[in-house]
Design a protein with these regions (language model features):
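Mg2+/Mn2+-dependent nuclease catalytic core
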Residues: 107-124
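Acidic-basic catalytic patches of nuclease active cores, encompassing PD-(D/E)XK
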Residues: 2-82
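Arginine/glycine-rich "motif VI" loop of SF2 helicases in the C-terminal RecA-like domain
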Residues: 123-136
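N-terminal low-complexity, charged segments
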Residues: 72-80, 100-101, 105, 132
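Short acidic, S/G/P-rich loop/turn micro-motifs used as interaction or catalytic elements
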Residues: 78-82, 106-110, 149-153
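Domain-level recognition of nuclease-like catalytic cores that cleave nucleotide substrates
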Residues: 7-8, 13-32, 133-176
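Short, flexible loop/turn motifs enriched in small residues
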Residues: 83-87
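Conserved catalytic cores of phosphodiester-cleaving nucleases, focusing on short active-site segments
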Residues: 90-92, 96-107
């Protein structure tokens, strides 16, 4: 009986020591909470740039990585739900501001496709991702990041469509 009591006592002490050693979980940022409250992407939050696919990660530069709160691969999360839709790629939170960016070939012939994608994104945010939509956005929240060379003629009617849709273009997404 005494042996059993000693074993039980040691197990209880080990459990208490483990609980004391565990690091406290960091507070969740508003972006993470909003994602977790959005049914279609509830498991999609990743710390830092981890949700961004390998080569695409090089297209995002943060001046201060401590302000980079998290990312969401929208396309991968909702692909099964909207297989035939023109889905937007990513959302990212930096310094409590949300950036939505699409990595895509930057050619005049692709403007219509990217405009369709941003229309889909705005509709999805308003109807399915209202918690994410409520978050503060960057000054220019919809960014088309070129995946290769830049071949968009600045004076075309397609370029005006891009501007009217609120999309800005960039070689890289520069944060901060």
């Amino acid at each position: 009986m005494r042996l059993f009591q000693n074993i039980w006592h040691n197990m209880a002490n080990n459990k208490n020591r483990k609980q004391k050693r565990q690091k406290p979980k960091p507070d969740k940022c508003a972006f993470q909470v909003a994602i977790e409250n959005t049914e279609e992407v509830k498991d999609g939050f990743c710390i830092g740039k981890q949700a961004i696919k390998g080569n695409d990660r090089n297209k995002v530069n943060a001046a201060d990585n401590n302000k980079l709160q998290g990312s969401l691969d929208i396309d991968s999360q909702v692909k099964a739900l909207y297989p035939n839709s023109s889905r937007w790629d990513y959302a990212l939170s930096y310094n409590d501001k949300i950036y939505f960016f699409e990595i895509h070939p930057a050619e005049t012939s692709e403007i219509e496709n990217v405009v369709k994608k941003v229309k889909w994104l705005k509709c999805w945010l308003k109807t399915k991702a209202t918690e994410i939509d409520k978050l503060p956005k960057s000054e220019h929240p919809y960014i088309w990041v070129q995946s290769g060379r830049y071949a968009i003629l600045p004076t075309t009617k397609e370029m005006r469509k891009l501007t009217m849709s609120g999309i800005t273009t960039a070689n890289k997404l520069s944060l901060g």
